[in-house]
Amino acid sequence: MAGFNIKHWFADGAFRTIIRNSAWLGSSNVVSALLGLLALSCAGKGMTPAMFGVLVIVQSYAKSISDFIKFQTWQLVVQYGTPALTNNNPQQFRNVVSFSFSLDIVSGAVAIVGGIALLPFLSHSLGLDDQSFWLAALYCTLIPSMASSTPTGILRAVDRFDLIALQQATKPFLRAAGSVVAWYFDFGFAGFVIAWYVSNLVGGTMYWWFAARELRRRNIHNAFKLNLFESARHIKGAWSFVWSTNIAHSIWSARNSCSTVLVGIVLGPAAAGLFKIAMTFFDAAGTPAGLLGKSFYPEVMRLDPRTTRPWLLGVKSGLLAGGIGILVALAVFIVGKPLISLVFGVKYLEAYDLIQVMLGAIVISMLGFPQESLLLMAGKQRAFLVAQTIASIGYIVLLFMFCHLFGVLGAAFAYFGGQCLDVALSLIPTLKAFFQRHSLLYNAAGEKS
């Protein structure tokens, strides 16, 4: 029964580290969520519902292209860089960062070209006129900074979650401040696009500066250089890992980042605006799971997957997140409607109907958050990819079908179904890996042998 004793849980140093790092990130995410609501509130009040929807679609389009193309280089740095640092192997860590940096540069270039090239073909479906089209094209130049996650991987590997927290508070502050100015002076659509653009640009630059400073402090020089194929040769299984996680994340983005765009295509910009408001509440409510996930992955990568310790750590973290999820869902249920009315106005109250449907998905997604990290730790990224593929195909089918049948409320039902599929299908390979854990490989150095 010791595994279910709460005091015993906190005797685990890794569990305490996860809680500590989550607290760092949580301190900034509470502020970020409030500032994000302020920015959306100003945009909602400063424009018509249709133009607010167009703004949301422009931002979601750029993020969707970024999410679809980019490699999950932060996972690469944590997967291979954390063991290298643990074993005092700076050269191997330098190889990992160089490979990761090169992937960011190449994928960022492909993403910006692809995003701008696709825009003329999608502009009519997205509801863009001539002015908003060019502003959307300008916003696409942010895609490389959105597609780069090497700096966050470095900061997680060196346990500098405080710097991540600082960046995560600064970007929404700048966005909120710019949105207040655009609303107060009635700068309209162009003003909000510029405000959001500048905040993203500054936020992305901060990550790179923090990461470079931490590398210098540890005397790890010349890590940020283009050396794609040579550095990869020193990292066993690197290409298999990055392609599996990239495809899995691209599929994930189709289910999440692209959802707002798809709703806009099927139902129009106004419906996309309502769905974005609901997703903002969902993302804010799901923040604890995201924070725990960012802290959980580096910790389990320091543990031997052949033992029960990382798996029990996953159970404890999932139960903790699920309990928090229930409390958060109840809070959103109680304050959601008056908060939407206060922040956005009564014309957006329909978003609360969507939120009510999506509350169950919050708890389910929180309970299942450790599964991805456990599968990556076990080297089962392809099994995770298969689960993501099936769940996402099911979600996209549900989204189109339910939107046609039930309107914008159908998008909420589809999202709930997609979250259930995701957790259920990922649980199957996770349980299989646990019962076969004695056959798993544990390569602490992360080097090619």
Residue ranges and their predicted role:
Residues 4, 15-79, 112-116, 240-270, ...:
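Signature of the first transmembrane helix
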Residues 70-87, 157, 278-306, 374-377:
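Helix-loop junctions and terminal segments of transmembrane helices
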Residues 11-15, 119-138, 334-363, 409:
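Interfacial segments at transmembrane-helix termini and the short loops linking adjacent helices
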Residues 16-32, 58, 67-120, 129, ...:
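Membrane-water interface segments that mark the loop-to-transmembrane alpha-helix transition
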Residues 73, 144-170, 185, 190, ...:
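Membrane-interface junctions at transmembrane-helix termini in multi-pass inner-membrane proteins
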Residues 57, 132-137, 166-222, 394, ...:
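Hydrophobic alpha-helical transmembrane segments
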Residues 20-40, 170-171, 175, 192-215, ...:
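Transmembrane helical elements of multi-pass membrane transporters/channels
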Residues 2-18, 189, 207-256, 305-309, ...:
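Interhelical loop/hinge segments that connect adjacent transmembrane helices in multipass membrane
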